[in-house]
């Protein structure tokens, strides 16, 4: 599923939303860390936390904790911000930074806003 920036004006199914989220994670990790480190992150998450890439949308809290363990809280928050900005852009949503929010909070908000689309 290829979506262009700000293209989604319609409600996405949960499966399509999940694919868009994983795509945003892929692109963001590549952008921030590079392809080799992205692959290492996925391998580490799968082998040490039993989180395969395709389960990230359903296990977002565990994914976020895995990033925090791998990189520390502050760097993982920066990575999460890149991911969420990319996801919001793909969904045509406006990103508003909230100091106490983590990646799962933003994704929950995006899911709610997606469900409200017709």
Task: List the predicted regions and their residue ranges.
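Long, compositionally biased intrinsically disordered regulatory segments in eukaryotic proteins
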Residues: 1-118
């Amino acid at each position: 599923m290829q979506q262009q920036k700000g293209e989604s004006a319609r409600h996405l199914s949960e499966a399509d939303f999940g694919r868009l989220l994983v795509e945003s994670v892929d692109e963001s990790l590549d952008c921030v860390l590079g392809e080799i480190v992205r692959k290492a992150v996925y391998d580490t998450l799968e082998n040490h936390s039993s989180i395969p890439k395709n389960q990230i949308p359903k296990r977002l809290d565990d994914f976020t904790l895995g990033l925090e363990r791998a990189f520390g809280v502050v760097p993982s928050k920066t990575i999460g911000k890149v991911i969420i900005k990319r996801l919001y852009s793909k969904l045509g949503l406006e990103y508003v930074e909230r100091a106490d929010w983590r990646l799962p909070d933003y994704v929950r908000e995006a899911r709610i806003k997606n469900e409200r689309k017709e």
